[in-house]
């Protein structure tokens, strides 16, 4: 069997930045275990599988598809950058002419629509609630040592722990912070936490571009030590920072080595629009 496959760098307009995701187009149903084997072979933080929902569907003309995401270790319920990569492949490489795509996923229907400055993802907005420090003290100390922490919240919907670093730190500190992910699986093995968000309040622009907040994201529980740019984490971050900054429109930067920018707009219906660009850097055929 031969499958069309692509790699797209998401949340960037330039190759070799942002977050790379593999995108596989499925004309027919794939054996269940083959999804995981392909994701392991691609060895990226996520591999997306776009499937037709009806035999008469066409990747170039239809507007609604099934979408699943796999890390090298397991299937995940939501992945922003691989959704953006999937939309970019359909819009820019397959030349799908619809103005909006709908993806049927484990997290419900997600929509991606064209915009002048990229692609807009319509995502759920997940609240984060205050978390008692002592319950997660070992996890925090293991990950970031004695780094000063200003706030801790937990998102039960996504099982992500959000740690806001002290406002005394700047972007450079977050970028250079050494985070110990190797021992997190031993410290947190209850299943409560599946992802760790570190975040920091933004700074005035000055000579550099202004961002409302910065972040990094770690998910060793699903075999992703650090994810370069994470749309699903921003479905939590958007809720948190909107409350603390009193803003509905925000500009975010994820401070991984590759780095990526996200535009954020909270909607009246309780969801969030996340805007980003994507660069398709590889296209080929996978033989299985």
From Swiss-Prot:
The keyword Isomerase applies. GO terms for biological process: biosynthetic process. It holds the Pfam family PhzC-PhzF. Keywords: Isomerase. InterPro entries: Phenazine_PhzF-like. GO terms for molecular function: isomerase activity. GO terms for cellular component: cytoplasm. Belongs to the PhzF family. Interacts with UNRIP/MAWD. This is Phenazine biosynthesis-like domain-containing protein.
